[in-house]
A protein has these predicted regions:
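Conserved P-loop NTPase motor core of helicases/translocases
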Residues: 165, 173-263, 300-315, 366-367, ...
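Walker A (P-loop) phosphate-binding loop of P-loop NTPases
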Residues: 153
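Conserved helicase motor core of SF1/SF2 NTP-dependent helicases
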Residues: 171, 181-184, 239-241, 258-553
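Short Lys/Arg-enriched alpha/beta "domain-start" segment
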Residues: 3-25
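Post-Walker A alpha-helix
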Residues: 160-161
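Short hydrophobic/aromatic beta-strand immediately N-terminal to the Walker A/P-loop
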Residues: 146-149, 177
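Pre-ATPase regulatory/linker segments immediately N-terminal to the P-loop/RecA-like helicase/translocase core
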Residues: 18-143, 201, 207, 214-221, ...
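Conserved lysine of the Walker
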Residues: 156-157
Length: 553
């Protein structure tokens, strides 16, 4: 309770004092998402985008154009990303949006007045549990908790979908509440359930809103009475649990107060411990299935005392092989067959993070793609020069974070080469991802790519930090490990020594993993111990590894 209070009063310097005031954010780039008529992506925000924006609807955006008057439009639902905001427009606006020349849009702005005090609502709900002072959240955990440990692309979402479908087939009365940290995670599971089900999933509901056009037929609003159906599976973001619910003819029924037959928490590594504890101790007599990967991204919180805390740190679940959990030994279902990556890439992150216990579905013979004169292997290391006081090779600061100009420009050029060579011989869709540890580095690369002409429409590009890539995958992944200023004196505090961050970064690639990293002559390189560990593991399978210098490229 004390930590919730601190988090409630705290926040980063940029967001302190925001509650109760209007928040203004401007974006200097607006693009329609490829393949959609109603989804738009706003990029390069003037400030950080609050996560609670995902929990509100009817978001009004003001667009400024070079050739017409300003235009105000409302959007139904948002996906918050570190450098962008993904918005889905109402179907009623589709014709209006399609008539707009978006290349003439110079700015988009949003003024947020009706904020949701998520931490305050969580605090109130937690206090409503009536727990005694000094109540030990860890020692009172019980065996109603079960875990699914799902490393990257081991079929976790499919496993959850089949479990839900199986329960609906087995029990004539079955009410399930699914909670996940983001709209994206909610939508991914809902889509997988529809994909795996042989019937029409008449019992499947997405609470309040969805960012996916294909799921609009299962969205239910607060007036609905679906919670009284004999069979229902309601999927919601975890942040709504403390305060939201149904208020139709049946009266006001919070999600917290409805009697469910099972609670399922997905992508659990990203769920703050206080939110998870609320779910656990509110539904003490209900089976709770917790699914995720302890070695993926942890919650974003401000208070140092619980910054990296989640349900996995509480129960000490941090390994695949022979885990010993606390305070009791919980039931754990381990998923071990990874379906995404070529064996060389899969074995790299298996040895790095999962005790070498993953098996690999794909064949090493599947990938025969060539990129011109560049003889790439499944795993590729390209070191770049770092010189302390150099304007191009030195470590710079942008918005208080680390950037390295040469690695930005080099990444752009090798990206352009890969795209150009791919387009010569291939028409099928291909995805390229560029992941960086620091947001400004990713922003610089993305802004340059957005200005690059003649990128083929069949090449999908994603650029961001690891938070953008959680749960995602690309055929070709660039991992751009630009160095921080503190790697010589504060090695334990830098992102490049965060095992979870590096694990997410290297496990997104399907066919090619290209790691750009500081040259071994860089001052302080020996302190990049996680990168060195990855290199040592990779070189055990040297036949599937290529090393190039930037000059050679």
């Amino acid at each position: 309770d004390a930590l919730i209070e601190l988090e409630y009063r705290g926040g980063t310097e940029e967001t302190k004092g925001d509650f109760g005031k209007s928040i203004n954010i401007t974006f200097n780039s607006v693009n329609k998402e490829q393949g959609s008529e109603r989804i738009y992506v706003l990029r390069n925000p003037s400030r950080s985008i609050p996560l609670w924006l995902e929990e509100i609807g009817d978001i009004e955006i003001k667009f400024t154009f070079s050739d017409r008057d300003e235009l105000k439009l409302k959007f139904e639902v948002a996906n918050v990303r570190e450098n962008s905001l993904r918005l889905k427009a109402s179907k009623a606006f589709e014709d209006v949006l399609n008539k707009i020349a978006w290349n003439k849009c110079t700015k988009a702005s949003i003024t947020l007045k009706n904020q949701i005090d998520l931490m305050g609502k969580l605090r109130s709900a937690f206090n409503g549990l009536g727990l005694e002072d000094g109540f030990n959240l860890k020692e009172n955990l019980d065996d109603n908790l079960k875990f699914i440990f799902g490393p990257p692309e081991t079929g976790k979402t499919t496993t959850l979908a089949k479990k839900i479908i199986g329960m609906m087939n087995e029990y004539s009365t079955c009410r399930i509440l699914v909670l996940a940290p983001t709209n994206t995670a909610c939508d991914e599971l809902a889509k997988k359930i529809k994909e795996c089900s042989k019937d029409d999933c008449a019992w499947l509901y997405r609470f309040v809103s969805t960012a996916d056009e294909s799921l609009e037929d299962i969205v239910v609003d607060r007036e609905s009475m679906v919670y009284e159906d004999e069979q229902c599976c309601v999927i919601s973001t975890m942040a709504r649990l403390p305060f939201d619910g149904f208020n139709g003819e049946g009266g006001y029924n919070k999600l917290l107060d409805i009697v469910w037959d099972m609670i399922l928490c997905d992508e659990a590594s990203m769920i703050p411990l206080a939110e998870m504890a609320l779910a656990i101790y509110n539904f003490v007599n209900t089976p709770i299935l917790i699914a995720g990967d302890p070695l993926q991204i942890k919650p974003i919180l401000h208070e140092e005392e619980w910054k990296d805390e989640n349900i996995y740190t509480m129960v000490n679940l941090d390994r695949v092989e022979n885990p010993v959990t606390e305070p009791i030994q919980f039931a754990i279902e381990n998923l071990s067959m990874q379906y995404r990556s070529l064996p060389a890439i899969g074995e790299l992150f298996s040895q790095y993070a999962y005790d070498g216990k993953l098996r690999h579905y794909r064949s090493a013979m599947e990938n025969h793609m060539k990129f011109g004169k560049l003889n790439l292997k499944p795993i590729n290391f390209i070191p770049f020069k770092v010189e302390r006081y150099d304007s191009v090779f030195g470590i710079k600061k942008l918005d208080g974070s680390n950037v390295h100009i040469y690695s930005v420009l080099f990444t752009l050029e090798i990206f352009k080469y890969i795209v150009r060579e791919y387009a010569k011989n291939h028409e099928e869709e291909y995805s390229i991802g560029i992941v960086c540890p620091y947001s400004p580095q990713a922003q610089l690369i993305e802004s340059l790519i957005m200005q690059t002409p003649n990128i083929p429409v069949n090449v999908k590009i994603t650029v961001g930090t690891v938070h953008r890539f959680q749960g995602g995958q690309c055929n070709f992944m660039f991992v751009v490990l630009n160095p921080p200023a503190g790697m010589k004196v504060a090695a334990d505090r830098i992102f490049l020594n965060n095992k979870n961050i590096l694990n997410v970064a290297i496990s997104r690639a399907q066919d090619f993993l290209c790691i750009l990293l500081p040259h071994c002559d860089t001052d302080g390189y020996e302190n990049l111990y996680e990168i060195n560990k990855i290199g040592r593991i990779a070189m055990k399978d040297y036949a599937n590894v290529a090393q190039y210098t930037c000059d050679q490229i």
